[in-house]
A protein has these predicted regions:
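Juxtamembrane/disordered regions of integral membrane proteins
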Residues: 1-150
């Protein structure tokens, strides 16, 4: 059952990340002065994190067993981290390069290198977090089903 939902989960996770990156890029492009953590950016990040966590929890709920949940969550996370991280990197490349150029003289390879590290970390963190959250979703669904009637 999880195999049929994993591609949809990847698409949802990539879309969540792309929306978040587009809004962040717009905020960075409009900023004057050094970047600051604002409530709108904080709320956007929190909403994206909650939506992503929900996708992984549902994926785990649909899994047949604990092992399948961890595997589906980790593989979905790795793929979503790779594809979504790359999409995010392309979206925020311009605004980040402009922001860095305002405050520092760095080699041309610096921003693309930093974004490549971002993609690699997104892949790893999404795989680990996805596996853990999917396992949690499986455990929560199993606990809800095994309760005795009141």
């Amino acid at each position: 059952m999880t195999r049929t939902w994993a591609p949809a989960a990847v698409v949802l996770l990539v879309a969540i990340g792309a929306i978040e990156a587009r809004v962040s890029a717009q905020q960075l492009g409009e900023s004057v002065g050094p970047p600051r953590l604002e409530s709108a950016g904080l709320m956007l990040t929190a909403a994206g994190l909650l939506a992503s966590a929900f996708v992984y929890l549902v994926l785990g709920h649909l899994a047949q067993d604990d092992r399948a949940a961890v595997r589906a969550g980790a593989l979905t996370g790795a793929l979503a981290g790779l594809v979504g991280g790359t999409v995010r990197a392309f979206i925020i490349d311009g605004p980040v390069a402009d922001l860095v150029a305002r405050y520092a003289a760095v080699p041309e390879w610096f921003v693309p290198g930093a974004l490549a590290v971002f993609v690699a970390l997104a892949c790893v963190v999404s795989a680990v977090g996805g596996g853990a959250l999917a396992w949690t979703g499986r455990r929560l669904s199993r606990a809800a089903r095994s309760r005795p009637p009141a």
